[in-house]
């Protein structure tokens, strides 16, 4: 395994291998003074982020340092990209500095796959346009696996702007591979065409999705959708598709809740649902557990691509 640009064609055994290795790292991370073998001591990893990021960038940096690697932090606004340098030239110049891998966040779909044709080094997709975000999906699956033991037969629905979501796409591919039952819940204007061809259930009624599901992955609503003709208003979206305590209490169904962040509080999810880590109540938020698990999962990815 040389690159991780998506989960669309990643076989079951590779996903399971990454999740199993992440579990080993997570066990050590839980100790008071976690210590890891510096398996990547001589490696240099370029964190090339052409879009803003908090959780993904910092967790990759922490993951690399736990394994002994050094990181080069790249931001487009403070680089020669702002002077017109092409993506290809940027990658070639970083490779000339003898980096061993690229972690790429880019606004264009397919950018990570494009870069694999430019460099001989390993490429990890940290989110490209509306294409894929494989490490986010891996940490989501890892988090659910911690709670349920397996994703086989698990009912999981993804709520929100599916059409523009790279997180949704990677989760659909990965969870179907692991045997989960996947559903989408969204206004019809924010559903991509052809999803029903994958054997995915579609809900346009949030109450019905909650009654069906064991867990929900809530997506950040990109606020510009309200002015782009996709939604009547943010308020209308919150009424019909916002995950709230009141809705869960009315249905009386306990739900595990995930969200990739950042959160639009009181739009796609209420603060009470987002912040409740455990009962009482009809939901348990796994949001911060996802962030913690992101380190272990990204350690597993770096170890698999660079140390084996």
Swiss-Prot record:
GO terms for molecular function: amino acid binding; aspartate carbamoyltransferase activity. Gene3D superfamilies: Aspartate/ornithine carbamoyltransferase. It catalyses: carbamoyl phosphate + L-aspartate = N-carbamoyl-L-aspartate + phosphate + H(+). GO terms for biological process: 'de novo' pyrimidine nucleobase biosynthetic process; 'de novo' UMP biosynthetic process; amino acid metabolic process. L-aspartate binds at residues 83, 166, 220. Carbamoyl phosphate binds at residues 55-56, 105, 133, 136, 261-262. Its EC number is 2.1.3.2. NCBIfam families: asp_carb_tr (TIGR00670), PRK00856.1 (NF002032). Heterododecamer (2C3:3R2) of six catalytic PyrB chains organized as two trimers (C3), and six regulatory PyrI chains organized as three dimers (R2). HAMAP family: Asp_carb_tr (MF_00001). Belongs to the aspartate/ornithine carbamoyltransferase superfamily. ATCase family. Catalyzes the condensation of carbamoyl phosphate and aspartate to form carbamoyl aspartate and inorganic phosphate, the committed step in the de novo pyrimidine nucleotide biosynthesis pathway. This is Aspartate carbamoyltransferase catalytic subunit. It comes from Chlorobium phaeobacteroides (strain DSM 266 / SMG 266 / 2430).
């Amino acid at each position: 395994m040389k690159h991780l640009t998506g989960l669309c064609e990643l076989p079951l055994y590779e996903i399971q291998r990454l999740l199993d290795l992440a579990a080993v790292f997570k066990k050590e991370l839980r100790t008071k003074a976690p210590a890891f073998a510096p398996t990547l001591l001589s490696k240099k990893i370029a964190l090339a982020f052409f879009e803003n990021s908090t959780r993904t960038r910092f967790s990759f940096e922490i993951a690399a340092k736990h394994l002994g690697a050094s990181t080069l932090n790249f931001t487009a606004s403070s680089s020669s990209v702002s002077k017109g340098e092409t993506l290809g030239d940027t990658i070639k110049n970083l490779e000339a500095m003898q980096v061993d891998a690229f972690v790429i966040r880019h606004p264009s779909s397919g950018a990570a796959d494009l870069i694999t044709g430019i460099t001989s080094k390993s490429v990890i997709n940290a989110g490209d346009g509306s294409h894929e975000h494989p490490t986010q999906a891996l940490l989501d699956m890892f988090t659910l696996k911690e709670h349920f033991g397996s994703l086989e037969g698990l009912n999981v629905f993804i709520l929100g702007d599916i059409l523009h979501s790279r997180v949704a796409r990677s989760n659909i591919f990965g969870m179907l591979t692991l045997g989960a039952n996947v559903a989408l819940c969204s206004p019809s204007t924010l559903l991509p065409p052809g999803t029903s061809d994958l054997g995915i259930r579609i809900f346009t009624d949030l109450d019905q999705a909650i009654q069906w599901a064991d867990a929900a992955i809530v997506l950040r609503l990109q606020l510009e959708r309200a002015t782009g003709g996709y939604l009547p208003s943010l308020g209308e979206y919150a009424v019909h598709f916002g995950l709230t305590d009141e809705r869960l209490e009315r249905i009386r169904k306990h739900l595990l809740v995930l969200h990739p962040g950042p959160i639009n509080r009181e739009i796609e999810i209420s603060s009470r649902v987002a912040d409740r880590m455990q009962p009482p109540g009809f939901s348990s938020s796994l949001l911060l557990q996802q962030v913690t698990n992101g380190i272990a999962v990204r350690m597993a990815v770096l170890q698999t691509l660079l140390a084996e």
